[in-house]
């Protein structure tokens, strides 16, 4: 039966952070070229006699064991990390931040300056038996502190032309802008973070937890697990390099962190140091584009005890109907793919399966390129290139505006999203959901009116007039203004439909849209050869700054957008707790600039659909990423 949870009426001030980055790409590898995959290839069938294995359908494929690396910001990678690592807190399905006291504690120890002590419980260990200590809480200094990166000679993350030694998503995060000092506690089990000011979201601006001894070992060429005593010595080497800012040594660690975890398969040849974690499960194997198998970590003591599930198998089935058929056949236990109307209907007909519909905090959006992507060597010269003159910048803005005017958002919502969730609607705020009491007030003032007033036909006519100013021979019949749009895989039914609607809609405004799908598209977002993109983001945390840092200048700005007023508003939202009125004012400042610059448009919030066999207990998806996995330790048959 269908169960619809309610979207929170309070403002979801949510900018998800996996490690230190705000959002994770939804369905970024929603369909690899694996259309030949058949359900018979699925391992560990759900009907096996032993009921200690859970088999999950994934529409993504593993690309990295490090989701904080700049090209690895994918939901599947984050899901694996969620199962294999534990930190100081997590979100439940009620938007409540829960402290993980099995792992450690944190507390405010000073209001002025604002200091928080983060402390690991004694006896916590990594999967190789090495103690978890303060050393393992220091990596954020390299992966999320621009100040430390510059001081240690690891590169200036603000320089988008040169990739820093740690190619991380964390720069420009709250950790980067708010943490001013890190010190180690006398017992070497904790760190004290000093913040720029009292911070509303300090609980989400803590240290990452990473087995730093593995970086030191791999940098030295080691390819097997060491003893705890050996690894403690390696930790101390890391600490020395950190405290002395040993540039050469830290760069070696950065190379390992940035490159070695980019794996698509795991087998006997894989360096076991890459698989060390403190989570409930460890990656046992991974077959490229097919499946990832995780087994219990026998040394796990950093979180809630599991309830009987000893193995989790995540099978990549990129074809939606095939995944649903696998559930119907009893070959898998959990389906959490990208739903379609037909898929929703098919799920509802499967006996012995609980189908859950819920409002997620994942959403569909489209962005246009405003400038060079970080690390791009060649300048962006596409249709939206702003150039250096007032005339060229005006032309670029006109063409961007035309793109959004002609973008067939309403048709996409009606034909693709409403059949899945009746409440689906075009989303005109960049922060507040339609259910928020602030939504109407925001969209009346943020500059989005031009993209919803009149009919789509009248908006498209206005768009065509703008395009013809610069492409006088273009027409709806023979569009000549070329725009290259980045999106996902050809076997993703939803995206196929969207791409076709977008191409046809933009053609009416004189745009000749190239909507060729790209394998592993999320790794290409920063590339200057693409003029625009559309896709989905998943949100994993609730922060005061909301979704605003999608438009923050710097290395995390894939589309080359930069606006001083936007950056100032984001900075104001990143500090002390603000009143609702001040939060609204800063959100409005951001939205007016982004809409005024014709930089971005949200399409709709995703209706969530997932399903599980009714013998799997405690299956209760959360609106926040990682959705179905958030309480995996409670699962049992």
Please provide the spans of the model-predicted regions.
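Surface-exposed binding/hinge segments that line
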Residues: 157-257
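Extracytoplasmic
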Residues: 51, 83, 103, 111-113, ...
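Extracytoplasmic/periplasmic ligand-capture domains
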Residues: 20, 93, 118-152, 270, ...
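Secretory targeting and sorting signals
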Residues: 10-48
């Amino acid at each position: 039966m269908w169960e619809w949870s309610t979207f929170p009426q309070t403002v979801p001030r949510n900018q998800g952070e996996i490690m230190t980055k705000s959002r994770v790409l939804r369905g970024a590898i929603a369909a690899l070229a694996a259309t030949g995959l058949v359900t018979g290839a699925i391992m560990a069938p759900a009907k096996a006699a032993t009921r200690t294995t859970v088999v999950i359908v994934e529409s993504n494929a593993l690309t990295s064991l490090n989701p904080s690396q700049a090209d690895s910001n994918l939901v599947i990678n984050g899901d694996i990390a969620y199962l294999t690592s534990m930190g100081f807190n997590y979100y439940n399905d009620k938007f409540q931040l829960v402290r993980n006291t099995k792992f450690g504690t944190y507390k405010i120890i000073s209001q002025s300056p604002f200091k928080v002590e983060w402390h690991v419980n004694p006896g916590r260990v990594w999967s190789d038996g090495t103690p978890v200590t303060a050393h393992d809480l220091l990596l954020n200094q390299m992966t999320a502190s621009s100040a430390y990166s510059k001081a240690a000679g690891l590169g200036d993350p603000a320089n988008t032309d040169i990739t820093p030694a740690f190619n991380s998503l964390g720069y420009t995060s709250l950790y980067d802008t708010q943490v001013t000092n890190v010190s180690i506690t006398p017992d070497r089990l904790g760190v004290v973070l000093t913040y720029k000011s009292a911070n509303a979201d300090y609980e989400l601006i803590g240290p990452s937890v990473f087995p730093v001894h593995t970086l030191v070992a791999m940098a030295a060429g080691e390819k097997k697990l060491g003893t705890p005593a050996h690894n403690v010595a390696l930790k101390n080497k890391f600490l020395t390099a950190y405290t002395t800012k040993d540039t050469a040594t830290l760069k070696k660690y950065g190379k390992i962190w940035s490159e070695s975890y980019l794996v698509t398969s795991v087998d006997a040849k894989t360096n076991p140091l890459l698989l060390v974690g403190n989570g409930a499960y460890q990656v046992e194997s991974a077959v490229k584009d097919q499946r990832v198998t995780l087994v219990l970590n026998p040394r796990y003591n950093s979180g809630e005890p599991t309830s009987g599930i000893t193995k989790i198998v995540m099978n990549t089935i990129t074809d939606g109907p095939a995944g649903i058929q696998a559930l119907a056949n009893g070959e898998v236990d959990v389906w959490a793919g990208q739903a379609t109307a037909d898929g929703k209907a098919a799920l509802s007909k499967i006996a012995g399966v609980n189908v859950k519909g819920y409002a997620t905090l994942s959403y569909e959006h489209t962005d246009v390129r405003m400038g060079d992507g970080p690390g791009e060597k060649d300048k962006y010269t596409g249709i939206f290139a702003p150039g250096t003159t007032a005339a060229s910048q005006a032309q670029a803005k006109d063409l961007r505006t035309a793109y959004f005017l002609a973008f067939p958002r309403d048709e996409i919502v009606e034909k693709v999203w409403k059949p899945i969730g009746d409440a689906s609607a075009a989303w005109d705020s960049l922060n507040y959901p339609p259910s928020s009491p602030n939504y109407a007030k925001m969209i009346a003032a943020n500059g989005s009116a031009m993209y919803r007033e009149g009919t789509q036909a009248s908006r498209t006519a206005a768009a065509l007039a703008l395009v013809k100013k610069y492409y006088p021979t273009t027409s709806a019949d023979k569009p000549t203004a070329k725009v290259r749009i980045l999106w996902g895989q050809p076997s993703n039914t939803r995206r196929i439909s969207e791409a076709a609607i977008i191409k046809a809609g933009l053609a009416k405004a004189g745009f000749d849209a190239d909507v060729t799908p790209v394998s592993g598209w999320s790794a290409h977002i920063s590339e200057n050869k693409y003029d625009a993109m559309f896709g989905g983001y998943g949100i994993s945390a609730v922060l005061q700054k909301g979704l605003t840092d999608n438009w923050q200048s710097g290395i995390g700005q894939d589309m080359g957008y930069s606006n001083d007023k936007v950056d100032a508003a984001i900075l104001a939202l990143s500090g002390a707790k603000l009143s609702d009125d001040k939060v609204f004012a800063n959100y409005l400042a951001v939205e007016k600039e982004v809409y005024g610059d014709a930089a971005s448009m949200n399409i709709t919030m995703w209706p969530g659909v997932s399903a599980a066999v009714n013998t799997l207990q405690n299956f209760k998806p959360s609106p926040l990423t990682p959705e179905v996995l958030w309480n995996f330790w409670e699962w049992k048959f």
